[in-house]
Amino acid sequence: MDRLLTISNHIGKNIRQFSTSTEEVLFEKKGKCLKVLLNRPKALNALNPNMVKILTPKYLEMKTKKDGEGVIVMKGAGEKAFCAGGDIRAIYDYKQLNEEQKSKTNDIGDLFFREEYILNNLIGTNPIAQVSIYNGFAMGGGIGLSVHGKFRVATENTVFAMPETGIGFFCDVGGSYFLPRLPNNYGMYLALTGSKLKGNNVYLAGVATHFVSNEHIQALEKEIEECENPTSQTINSILTKYHDKSKSTSNEYNDNLGDIERIFGKNSVKEIFEQLELLENSEWAKQTLKTLKSVSPSSLMVVFEQMKQGAKLPSLAKCLEMEFRISQHFLEKPDFFEGVRALLVDKDKNPKWLPPSIDQIDQTLVNSYFKPLSNNKELKF
């Protein structure tokens, strides 16, 4: 349960429900550079609906710009996190309302995911360069704010994860687009296990586009701020210069890479389990199997299918449309709310998943998470 405790601490800590503070995202213009600061350091800059509402108009303004007419630098406030996830507790709290109370407020389960995914797509189609600096934890919803932009910078302090299977959910915010496109089946491995990548390994895996040592970050930011022609090519050249200056001996990414590529390229979750069980003398295989057996079986099965389908979809927008469908079906099932209960509410770190085993989940049940929504609820771009 150590992994579940990590998720609890880094996603749900100190999340407030319906904040309207305009100070939760701060903007500063320096020349052609727009600096964006995610400003909830006590909550590890966890993304909430208010922050989505603040960010969306800014990205809408940029739709008509051309490459080179500006550059965005996004960071998290404080020294611990870029953005450690999303406001999942608020969705749980909405579920606990009675029907009369629900009738007096918006369905946050629909509204939050719909607006968040719209923002994710705006970031992914933004014509100007965005540089996201992973100054600490970068997880879940924070990945949706950054990975679809042109550039992501890892530092020694970066900790990346998509830990959603551990809370009975799935790798959303465009996870079905970027994860299957990582080399060596590493995206499938990260999606199913929620494993963390640290420092230079975030770059080696392909999540970050560059690695820059902490000692060079201030100079990097200053050069981007002073850039008079911030085309994607120019910004890439600046980033590459500081990347080349930076030294890192961290390369755990390559540990077990052959086994990850082989095992997580199998045709089913059951086959992945079987292959891990065959590696009796591998501590990595034992720990990986232990992790997979601790997370939601439903999440495992759905995420596996999500990665397979996402690999074939032509665009981020199509992946987000699929993910919105999946998100709403998850909110009709028990595991997400049980995961949040166990990690954030009762904090017993002992979720009771239903069904409790992958052997009790057939393809028909998996397919039900991908069915079109009724009553014109579909997200369409």
From Swiss-Prot:
Transit peptide, start-end: 1-25
Keyword tRNA-binding applies: no
The keyword Ribosomal protein is annotated on this UniProt entry: no
Gene3D superfamilies: 2-enoyl-CoA Hydratase, Chain A, domain 1 (3.90.226.10)
Molecular function via GO: 3-hydroxyisobutyryl-CoA hydrolase activity
GO BP: valine catabolic process
Metabolic or biological pathway, per its Swiss-Prot or TrEMBL entry: Amino-acid degradation; L-valine degradation
Gene Ontology cellular-component annotations: mitochondrion
Spans traversing the lipid bilayer: none
Top-level taxon of the source organism: Eukaryota
A Pfam family the protein falls into: ECH_2
Enzyme class name: hydrolase
Binding, substrate: 116, 141, 164, 172
Keywords per UniProt: Branched-chain amino acid catabolism, Hydrolase, Mitochondrion, Transit peptide
Catalytic activity annotation: 3-hydroxy-2-methylpropanoyl-CoA + H2O = 3-hydroxy-2-methylpropanoate + CoA + H(+)
Cross-referenced InterPro entries: ClpP/crotonase-like_dom_sf, ECH_dom, HIBYL-CoA-H
Record EC number: 3.1.2.4
SUPFAM superfamilies xrefs: ClpP/crotonase
NCBIfam families xrefs: PRK05617.1 (NF004127)
Cross-referenced PANTHER family: 3-HYDROXYISOBUTYRYL-COA HYDROLASE, MITOCHONDRIAL, 3-HYDROXYISOBUTYRYL-COA HYDROLASE-RELATED
Family of this protein: Belongs to the enoyl-CoA hydratase/isomerase family.
Protein name: 3-hydroxyisobutyryl-CoA hydrolase, mitochondrial
Gene that produces this protein: hibch
